[in-house]
A protein has these predicted regions:
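Conserved, well-structured ligand/cofactor-binding cores
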Residues: 1-461
């Protein structure tokens, strides 16, 4: 079936546009020009653009620059886009003009078409929907708004959920002692609660870092217009816009104290991405620890048993793999890679404008979404559900030669080292060898070498 087209005009001439498309000429030019990938701009970014258009229309109406009926129609159309009703009308590739002008015009055109249909007369993409704005302040603002909304409403709650799940598991395993490991080698004992507490602290610190990095993200570029001077925008626009946007999005924003900073650089986003990378590093460490602890079940550490979620091999029957920790490590790797892309893109601010904004938006929002989902998966399908293999823990503790460290203050380092070597070579319990090699009675040795007491620190007496 042959597709029908209509002719649209812009400042460069005529363009064939699909007859049923809500967008107009400039969006079609971008669709024709940019066929570099299968990635379109993230839905969260499109929603942020619509929030911006909605808040801008309200602001311009309040300032007396835009007729109330047109402003309301723009606001209604913007809300429909926010609600995801027209996702297919935003087809532009991520790899497009570096300012993101194509995506700004895509939003302007779709919203103008919808508003025109509501009113029965033409609403202009440029003169009405884009009033008092430039792509150069809209796109940086859309990055900031989409990131702030999704971090506050999605990622931070996910990190809190993971932290609480770790806390619950700490309580459940508070008295369970295991062999500690440094350099992947046997070390002094720790409790599961101590080990999980370290993980929880990583997650809590990551959440704090992300929260702190949100402060400059919430200081918006909107109002700087083309180069940061605010040309063609009412001097009151930025403050009222930020207030309106805060009410619409339920996230508190304010105007930047220096629009030149927000347009010419993406330093605040680079900083935020660095904090997302820190969270990814924490998840990578936790996931890999879980994989090691679950290794076996017979020829590995076998300290825990992760929930079996799916068959692990197409050739080896009965094999079950730690699929959730593995998936989380891949998420972490992707987020770390995204941070590198954002860092390079952040360097691309030439004079008054950064020109890698779309790829920054794509990678930043992907990182936020991936981390959100990974936190939930790790919490619900790994941390909350793993079981401890107490028999393996007790066997490893009994033969751990490093327990002799507790005897250092009593018999000296060299004597303790001899006992540790003999116990290891003979595969015997450190308690039995120490009883033979020292003049300490067994009751004293049992007290000194009690693994639970050794998790509490201090000096043996």
């Amino acid at each position: 079936m042959t597709r029908e087209y209509r002719i649209e005009k812009d400042s460069m001439g005529e363009v064939k546009v699909p007859a049923d498309a809500l967008y107009q000429a400039q969006t079609q030019r971008a669709v024709d020009n940019f066929t570099l990938s299968r990635y379109t701009m993230p839905s969260a970014f499109i929603a942020a653009l619509a929030y911006i258009k909605q808040a801008a229309a309200m602001t311009n109406a309040q300032l007396g620059h835009l007729e109330g009926d047109i402003a309301q129609a723009i606001a209604n159309a913007s809300q429909a886009v926010i609600d995801g009703q027209y996702a297919e009308q935003f087809p532009i590739d991520v790899f497009q003009t570096g300012s993101g002008t194509s995506s700004n015009m895509n939003a302007n055109e779709v919203i103008a078409t919808l508003a025109s249909r509501e009113l029965g007369y033409a609403v202009s993409p440029n003169d009405h929907v884009n009033m008092g704005q430039s792509s150069n302040d809209v796109i940086p603002t859309a990055i900031q708004v989409s990131a702030a909304i999704n971090i506050e409403q999605q990622l931070l709650p996910a990190l809190v959920h993971l932290s609480q799940t770790l806390a619950d598991k700490q309580s459940e395993l508070a008295d369970v002692v295991k062999t500690g490991r440094t350099h992947l080698m046997d070390a002094m004992p720790v409790t599961f609660a101590q080990e999980l507490g370290g993980w929880k602290s990583q997650i809590d610190h990551a959440a704090q870092g992300i929260s702190h990095a949100l402060s400059p993200i919430k200081a918006l570029a909107q109002g700087g217009t083309a180069v940061g001077t605010g040309i063609n925008a009412d001097p009151r626009f930025a403050r009222i816009f930020a207030d309106n946007l805060s009410q619409l999005s339920h996230v508190t924003f304010q105007p930047s104290d220096n629009f030149f900073y927000n347009l010419s650089s993406q330093d605040c986003v680079v900083g935020l991405s660095g904090q997302l990378k820190t969270a990814a590093v924490a998840l990578m460490k936790i996931a890999n620890d879980l994989r090691w602890m679950n290794s076996g079940p017979l020829a590995g550490l076998g300290e825990i048993e992760l929930q079996g979620l799916q068959p692990g091999s197409s050739i080896m029957p009965g094999k079950v793999n730690p699929v959730i920790p593995e998936a989380v490590t891949m998420v972490a790797a992707q987020v770390i890679g995204n941070d590198t892309t954002i860092t390079v893109a952040g360097q691309s601010g030439n004079f008054q404008l950064n020109v890698m904004l779309p790829v920054i938006a794509h990678n930043l929002l992907e990182s936020i979404a991936l981390l959100t989902n990974a936190c939930h998966a790790l919490a619900d399908k790994a941390i909350a559900t793993f079981k401890v293999r107490h028999d393996n823990l007790e066997k490893a503790l009994a033969k751990n030669p490093i327990l002799v460290t507790a005897l250092n203050p009593v018999i000296g380092y060299l004597k303790a080292a001899d006992i540790a070597k003999k116990a290891y070579q003979q595969g015997r319990a450190i308690l039995d060898v120490a009883a033979e090699e020292t003049d300490l009675d067994r009751a004293t040795l049992e007290a000194l070498l009690d693994p639970k007491k050794l998790t509490q620190g201090g000096i043996a007496h």
